[in-house]
Design a protein with these regions (language model features):
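N-terminal binding-site loop/beta-alpha segment at the start of enzyme catalytic domains
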Residues: 2-117
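CE4/NodB-like, metal-dependent polysaccharide N-deacetylase domain
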Residues: 141-162, 182-185
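Conserved beta-strand positions in the central sheet of alpha/beta enzyme cores
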Residues: 55, 90-92, 159-162, 192, ...
Length: 317
């Protein structure tokens, strides 16, 4: 990006986002040609799944509070289709989103799936009501949850199945042991974990081959730095959720302010800068910014072309 202030349209043009749409599975994304999302580069999940390093988190496609049907079902499916058109080939979801609704939407929008599309889902959280996110790591629940996800997604095997969170009432070894059985049965290709600290990750890796970790991480919350370091050292993928949000526990508010100033000077939006910061932070990063808007999706994907230099990263802090 140049030092001058750019319009939103110029940013999108620079990233190649303002292009004619293509049919899912038949355009550049499916053929392996350059796409807006591919400008972020690629990484490999589990040594055999190569994806563009800018994915899509589908959580926001369902109703308010991540509950129930989307306000506009066709609009939600349009976002998924546009993501694939732009070269996004990693989509993350969970059975808790809706619950179940999100996985159904993905299948409705994209099945039969284009070649090379990797779908990751999660199990281990149940939603008895809008307000509740209860953990259930019982082996029998995880087996039923995985098999239900397979049906909703219309898959024979889930590329990446992630334990959504540790259930404190169930030994971690029991939860992941059942997921390992599902993997041996061919229902899961690779196993990931979510909301794990470094010690928990070490325990998990004694039970099953973990290829990814999905934790909260952004410019102002780096509480998972120790986990990220393990991912970098051992070739695991780190999937950061909540790339923009702030909370009282965040310890790097000054860095967020610095990144906001950087974004303004470069003529990019703060969400684009936040995504670009994650991409620059570590080669293990696979950001999955989510939205229910095609316009916001295009803006997020354009961040794949935004570069932050090493010197600028040091200045941001």
């Amino acid at each position: 990006m140049t030092m001058t202030t750019l319009t939103r349209r110029q940013v999108l043009q620079h990233a190649g986002v303002l292009m004619t749409g293509v049919a899912v599975g038949t355009g550049a994304a499916a053929a392996g040609r350059a796409t807006p999302a591919s400008q972020a580069g690629t990484l490999v999940i589990g040594k055999d799944l190569t994806v563009n390093r800018l994915g899509f988190g589908a959580m926001r496609l369902v109703g308010p509070d991540i509950w129930g049907e989307p306000l506009d079902r066709e609009a939600a499916k349009a976002v998924l289709r546009r993501a694939v058109e732009l070269g996004v080939n990693f989509i993350d979801t969970a059975d808790a989103y809706g619950p179940a609704t999100d996985e159904v939407l993905i299948a409705e929008a994209l099945y039969p799936y284009p070649k090379g599309l990797v779908i990751a889902t999660k199990g281990g959280i149940v939603r008895p009501s809008r307000e509740r996110w209860d953990r259930d790591g019982r082996p029998e629940h995880l087996r039923a949850a995985c098999e239900a996800s397979l049906k909703r997604l219309r898959l024979e095997r889930i590329d990446l199945y992630q334990l959504h969170a540790i259930d404190p009432n169930v030994p971690l070894e029991d939860s992941l042991g059942e997921i390992a059985k599902l993997q041996r049965e061919g229902k899961i290709r690779h196993v990931g974990v979510s909301n794990f600290n470094a010690d928990e990750l070490a325990r998990a890796r004694k039970v099953v081959d973990v290829v990814s970790v999905q934790n909260r991480y952004n410019v102002s919350d780096r509480s998972s730095d120790a986990v990220l370091a393990v991912c970098e050292r051992d070739g695991l993928v780190f999937i950061p959720w909540s790339p923009l949000s702030q909370s009282p526990r965040d310890s790097n508010a000054g860095a967020r302010t610095a990144l906001e100033a950087w974004a303004k000077a470069r003529g990019v939006s703060f969400p684009q800068a936040a995504i670009a910061w994650l991409l620059a932070r570590s080669p293990a990063m696979l950001p999955i910014p989510g939205t229910s808007s095609v316009a916001h999706l295009e803006e997020n994907v354009a961040a794949a072309a935004v570069r932050i230099t090493d010197a600028e990263m040091r200045a941001i802090g």
